[in-house]
Design a protein with these regions (language model features):
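Beta-strand-rich binding/interaction modules
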Residues: 67-73, 421-422, 435-438, 443-509
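N-terminal, polar/Ser/Thr-rich
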Residues: 1-43, 69, 74, 123-126, ...
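A surface-exposed beta-strand-loop module
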Residues: 58, 63-122, 178-182, 492-502, ...
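Amphipathic alpha-helical substructures
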Residues: 365-455
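Acidic/His/Gly-enriched intrinsically disordered linker/tail segments
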Residues: 314-378, 382, 399
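Zinc-dependent metallopeptidase catalytic helix centered on the HExxH motif
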Residues: 237, 279-339, 392
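Hydrophobic helix-coil surface modules that form long, contiguous segments used
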Residues: 42, 133-135, 143-296, 325
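Glycine/proline-rich low-complexity spacer/linker segments in large multi-domain proteins
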Residues: 12-19, 95, 104-154, 201-209, ...
Length: 524
């Protein structure tokens, strides 16, 4: 499947309404890897809470490339039907709160989306890894594959004993059976299906620890193949600094009792923020920290996307926009506001390919990442620094280990700012496309008491008729300067300013708070 096909239309056909009648509480995923055959054997148990006792059908997302050998419902064998992407169990009305479904299956996993399940090879040895986002966990294990149905998970991976097998959460046990070795990993915090991952390869391990502000410790691991190991360790060493900045900005690391780690995989597009175990593509491990922003971005996802998950894929910007802006916030915290401006300047664009909420072309375009970051930057200007940073911490605290929608974020933002932000959210998130595009001219004339400057601003964009926004204007005088803020509310606006001295130069939005272009027509 091409990435351009991963949109809300596809996802709407993949998930069914009846899935909301159930709530997954726990996955027990046992996978035996057969790399020479590029096949797997699976044994999965799912504990589900029944929300609607009248629902007769349990629909699990599970691609039909897998041969299902057995399905048990509460330890009784049941019949099931298959479609291309789903497995449906018809059940009698159950007067119970929870049910347990067990499935045994085998087959060759499909490679969809960003790859989903990969039998790869590096340096003459097998390398196996997964990447499920957004809806391809079900290419290799049965699940309810929607982001807001988080559950706890036990993941056991069996492979040849010469391989190290990795997953989310905390390592519980390693057991040997003949030439096979099984690694058992366990999550103590809820996880979305798309964030569950396995890696198995010839990994070497580097360990360090982070000591939090409250003196708690987080185990940090770097897993890389031998020829990239030293480079990976060098790229990984600054995670203590990144963690401290994000802890100060957002709150404590959300998976403190498990770990944070990076694992090398052979993905060509960059990195993937699997919960507690980010995958880093081989080409992005340099030993010279060339891709520091990417590593910072993936760590930020542990707060934004993993701990605070999206309620639906329509809300994907809450993952990617927040993590992209976190890159800029890191550089601001460590190097000053100019560093933030430099970071954001590299993330500008026209963004004319849809709205930020429910992007209609591609869930993973620059619109979602970069415009999402700019919208947070403009929101910061709109509500003020103090309120903005309190908002981030409280948004995280309120929704950690849960899921939030864009409307949830709007509601808490209005609560903390004590402002009606419907206009802001409509023009930048729900309805508006593109950016503010303007042309302007100005004239300055003397008066009895100084000078009067008239600035004429005209909005030109097609994606949204009239943006309303605060606009800083900087006046440069011979020996001084000043900044005044005006609120633009019309498509064609005239701003009149009286000053004691003649402005030598005028700059609109001098500190780059707006996702906007200002093209001067004439000046004096």
């Amino acid at each position: 499947m091409n990435l351009k096909d991963i949109d809300e239309k596809f996802i709407a056909n993949y998930n069914v309404k009846g899935q909301k009648s159930f709530d997954v509480l726990h996955y027990s995923i046992n996978i035996e890897l057969l790399p020479d055959e590029k096949r797997i054997k699976g044994n999965v148990a799912i504990i589900l809470k029944v929300n609607n006792l009248d629902e007769q059908y349990l629909t699990l997302n599970f691609y039909d490339n897998m041969k299902v050998n057995e399905v048990l419902l509460n330890d009784k064998q049941v019949e099931f039907t298959r479609s291309k992407t789903n497995l449906v169990i018809k059940q009698d009305r159950l007067n119970r709160d929870t049910i347990v479904v067990k499935l045994k299956y085998e087959g060759e996993p499909k490679r969809l989306g960003f790859g989903s399940f990969n039998f790869d090879e590096m340096n003459g040895k097998k390398l196996i890894y997964t990447l499920n986002e957004p809806v391809f966990a079900s290419t290799w294990y049965p699940c309810i594959d929607i982001p807001d149905d988080k559950a706890l998970a036990d993941i056991s991976i069996t492979n040849d004993s010469s391989y190290v097998s990795l997953s989310n959460g905390k390592l519980i046990a390693i057991t040997n059976s003949g030439s096979k070795r099984t690694y058992h990993w366990k999550t103590f915090y809820p996880i979305s299906t798309y964030l569950i991952a396995i890696y198995s390869g010839d990994y070497k391990t580097h360990y360090q620890k982070y000591v939090s502000i409250s003196k708690d410790t987080v185990d940090l691991f770097c897993y890389a193949l031998p020829d990239k190991f030293e480079d990976a360790v060098r790229d990984f060493t600054d995670h203590n600094k990144y963690l401290r900045v994000f802890e100060e900005l957002f709150g404590f690391y959300p998976f403190i009792n498990e770990k944070y780690s990076i694992a090398q995989f052979n993905w060509v597009y960059g990195a993937m923020e699997h919960q507690t175990i980010t995958g880093i593509g081989t080409d992005y491990i340099t030993g010279r920290k060339f891709f520091q922003d990417m590593i910072i971005h993936e760590l930020a996802h542990q707060w934004w996307g993993n701990a605070v998950g999206p309620k639906s894929w329509e809300d994907i910007w809450l993952n990617e926009g927040f993590s992209t802006y976190s890159e800029a916030l890191y550089w601001e915290k460590t190097s000053g506001f100019d560093a933030l401006k430099t970071t954001l300047a590299a993330k500008t664009g026209t963004f004319k390919n849809g709205t930020l909420y429910n992007p209609d072309r591609n869930l993973f375009s620059s619109l979602v990442y970069d415009k999402g970051a700019w919208v947070l930057h403009m929101l910061r200007k709109e509500i003020g620094d103090s309120t903005f940073f309190k908002l981030l911490r409280n948004y995280y605290d309120r929704f950690k280990y849960k899921n939030a929608s864009t409307r949830d974020f709007q509601k808490i933002t209005e609560e903390f700012s004590k402002k009606n932000l419907s206009r802001f959210f409509d023009q930048w998130i729900f309805k508006g496309q593109g950016i503010i595009e303007t042309e302007y001219d100005y004239q300055t004339n003397p008066t009895d008491e100084g000078f009067i400057t008239k600035i004429n601003i005209k909005q030109l964009q097609n994606g949204y008729d009239i943006y309303k926004f605060p606009l800083d204007i900087k006046f440069i005088y011979e020996n001084d300067s000043s900044i005044q803020t005006f609120y633009v509310t019309k498509k064609e606006e005239t701003i009149i300013i009286e000053t004691k001295y003649k402005p030598l130069e005028i700059y609109l939005d001098p500190d780059k708070w707006l996702l906007a272009t200002f093209t001067i027509i004439t000046d004096n």
